Amino acid sequence: MENQKQYPMTQEGFEKLERELEELKTVKRPEVVEKIKVARSFGDLSENSEYDAAKDEQGFIEQDIQRIEHMLRNALIIEDTGDNNVVKIGKTVTFVELPGDEEESYQIVGSAESDAFNGKISNESPMAKALIGKGLDDEVRVPLPNGGEMNVKIVNIQ
């Protein structure tokens, strides 16, 4: 049997995916079925753009359902051990870019729940990879997309 990729995530991320799946199954799926039904009532399906659009939407919804079900089946829930000495998935890390004193904070989460606009970065991102395993007051070199790097100092882990 082939090893399935595991999806590390927080309990909060797991529950969010469960809610998203429920919405897809109980709201979005029935809505698109109704759209298909209405579009069929227009007659000839060969040139029925409403029907084609609804079928496309149905395909996307079914893909999303399968993707989320797969991630939930293979989820690896990251438990908070209470250890705030080392950066790991689930922890919120505060650091300052050196030289400087302006603080930035990010929670490191699994890729399935990353949302940079809300301060959640994927454990697979260059920033998270550089920070994971490091400790309080450590100075860390973080690779940048342009090939450069920035130096940061970890000032808080929670």
From Swiss-Prot:
Listed Pfam families: GreA_GreB (PF01272), GreA_GreB_N (PF03449)
Entry annotated with the keyword Cytoplasm: no
Record carries keyword DNA-binding: yes
Coiled coil: 4-70
GO process terms (BP): DNA-templated transcription elongation; regulation of DNA-templated transcription elongation
Domain of life: Bacteria
Entries under PROSITE patterns matching the protein: GREAB_1, GREAB_2
GO molecular function, one term: DNA binding
Classification via SUPFAM superfamilies: FKBP-like (SSF54534), GreA transcript cleavage protein, N-terminal domain (SSF46557)
Keywords associated with the record: Coiled coil, DNA-binding, Transcription, Transcription regulation
Function per UniProt: Necessary for efficient RNA polymerase transcription elongation past template-encoded arresting sites. The arresting sites in DNA have the property of trapping a certain fraction of elongating RNA polymerases that pass through, resulting in locked ternary complexes. Cleavage of the nascent transcript by cleavage factors such as GreA or GreB allows the resumption of elongation from the new 3'terminus. GreA releases sequences of 2 to 3 nucleotides.
Record family assignment: Belongs to the GreA/GreB family.
Name of protein: Transcription elongation factor GreA
